[in-house]
Amino acid sequence: MLYPTPIAKLIDSYSKLPGIGIKTATRLAFYTIGMSADDVNEFAKNLLSAKRELTYCSICGRLTDDDPCSICTDSTRDQTTILVLEDSRDVAAMENIQEYHGLYHVLHGLISPMNGISPDDINLKSLMTRLMDSEVSEVIVATNATADGEATSMYLSRLLKPAGIKVTRLARGLAVGADIEYADEVTLLRAIENRTEL
């Protein structure tokens, strides 16, 4: 169906979001048009503000509005342990269980030979720099239980073990193919408590 240009552009914008097909984009566009002017202005303001004010922590790579982030600058956290995650959303999931008190490192992706993503394409270089300049004795690999997550964890294990750093992996409370951000808090707690050495 042919829509007026402003609606067509809005549909196109929404359809660029992950998991949003043309039907959902159309629904969102029409819903947005039906919102009050104040709500639309607030939505647009918040979207622009998030894009403008957020950055990645120069230490851990987590999405933050401070650099370095509040976790990296918290001296009460365990400085000897780093939990390595694929995405900033995974940090939020781990923080919600309130049982892990170490540091984080966000990779912004996983090694994926099938997709042409090599170790140089993810945030590994800064992890290696952190490990050389710190007192870290354990790295917990908390990548998703997928082929790419496994490839990344094995790569990290082979890279870090010769340096004398203990490398562990979250326990298998997480289902194969499951994303950490969608796991419930009890599952995440059990996974971190029962992590295994690689």
From Swiss-Prot:
Pfam families: RecR_C, RecR_HhH, RecR_ZnF, Toprim_4. This is Recombination protein RecR. A zinc finger (C4-type) spans 57-72. Belongs to the RecR family. It comes from the Bacteria. May play a role in DNA repair. It seems to be involved in an RecBC-independent recombinational process of DNA repair. It may act with RecF and RecO. SMART domains: TOPRIM. One of its GO terms (molecular function) is zinc ion binding. One of its GO terms (biological process) is DNA repair. Keywords: DNA damage, DNA recombination, DNA repair, Metal-binding, Zinc, Zinc-finger. CDD domains: TOPRIM_recR (cd01025). Residues 80-175 form the Toprim domain. The keyword Metal-binding applies. It comes from Streptococcus pneumoniae (strain ATCC 700669 / Spain 23F-1). PANTHER family: RECOMBINATION PROTEIN RECR.
